[in-house]
Amino acid sequence: MSGAAAIAVGGKLGFAKTYAEPQQTATTAAADLAFINGRIHTMDSNNRIVSQALIRNGRFAAVGDNILGQAANVKRVNLMGKTVIPGIIDAHNHIVLVGNRPGWHTPLEHVFTIADAIAQLKSRSAEVPRGEFITTIGPISAMQFVERRLPNLSELDAVDRPVYIQAAQGGTRMNSAGKAWLEARGVMVGADGAITGPALGLALQTLRKELLTPDTRKRTALGALQYYSRLGITTHRDCGAFQADDPAPGIASENTYTMHNPFLALHREEKLPARMRIDFLHQDPPTANPSLPTLSQRLRNSFPFFGDDWMRTGGIGEFTGGGVEGLRAIAKAGWRGEDHALNLAGVTNLIKDRETVNAEIPITQLRWIISHIPEFPVELANRANALGIGVLVGWGPLRTGMNVGPPYRMLMGHAIKKGYHSDGGDITVINPWLNFYTIITGQNLAGQPILGEQNLTRQETLWLATAANKWFIWENDIGSIEVGNHGDLVVLDRDYFSVPDEDLKRMRSLVTIVGGKVVHNDGIV
């Protein structure tokens, strides 16, 4: 199939058919595409805004104004003044966990009222065979709804399929059909459809045991990538899961040796609608004489940065494991390593350990990463920068409290490498627009101030999620709309740079292009 010539102004983005069954292709085949009459924010070093961009053979062949002339054999897309940005790069999330959820997984990160959530689930039920589960597990929070709660049992009973919702914040809710299904398998569910205590882990474990197959995993993996394509993400850097050989009760656990299989299958079939970069999480214990049983095997038997433009391995993270000895092994192997920090003591220790290793084995060229950093004073930024370490920030829409960081404004004035990540998939949201909302306004999804004076402008926020993330992906040909770069772009449904703050949360893609392929379109005729 091929793209067509014009975008219909005012088209509504449809999320009803969120996860379709895998079709023959997940993308429209690459063709020469000329985008004209737009406001194309290139995010190049000069922050140029141009009206035209030509994609040929999957890469930008021309970018500017009046560049096309009488070019032949090109499909022209009239943007009619729409805003275009480079494809969003989420430089640290857990998309692979989302792609391995049981049931007919249905994201709800784009709805903000209980009524809209129920409408979404009811629409989804039309695609789901009778008696099969609709699930929403992970990237959803009570905070995102104006009611500040999850749907209750009576509300979910409007959906004529079993429903299971497990939120990053707000607990777990089911409807009567889902409640009866789990209770028949020995899982205790409250009269209100809530699950608490040990029963919560047992519920998820039971769903995984009974509902997951290679085919359902593949369906969900494709659906997850398609969903976030509709939100403008063109590159995901996945940062792993906690290892579990058997179906696990924990939301952040999976078999880390097989969980990539559905994504690899999509890659083999050329159905990936987004680029994937895969890091490997390890947790070998830091003992006096560690054997590093899993990390040593990974470093010995895997290749870093191996693959193609659609799927490629990366490094070790979001945990390196093995303490200082693990860091030494990673440095000796020449791999990238990443750990997260949740407080000042944690990030201080991470930097101290890296200084110890760097004194023995230089790491300054390995682009090591520390993520999250809610507390990160200038002195630590100086020390991290001296080691060649970059920091990933985001991770905030569901947080509460005053001045809980990260210190975005300080970082923008510092030489240290910085980029955007959501960390979404299990404990927070992936939706970039919810994360951007917090970075720009300084408020969480409940409208509570959490950043003090550390919030950023819209231009700065977009830069973190596009051009700045080249360094973290270790690729120079994504993240900006420039000649020679991969043809990744997003046509937005509204102008990101001028809409009211509250509308930021509702931003969507009308058209998402990856490598010249149309991976999402709404309104192309």
What does each of the following model-derived ranges do?
Residues 522-525:
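Glycine- and charge-enriched low-complexity intrinsically disordered segments
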Residues 499-501:
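Residues that cap or delimit alpha-helices
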Residues 3-6, 10, 22-36, 41, ...:
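Divalent metal-binding segments
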Residues 304-306, 384-388:
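Structural alpha-helical segments in enzyme catalytic/regulatory domains
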Residues 331, 336, 340, 345-368, ...:
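His/Asp/Glu-enriched, well-ordered alpha-helical/loop segment
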Residues 16, 20-22:
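Boundary at the C-terminal end of the N-terminal hydrophobic targeting segment
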Residues 10-16:
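Membrane-interface motif at the C-terminal end of an N-terminal transmembrane signal
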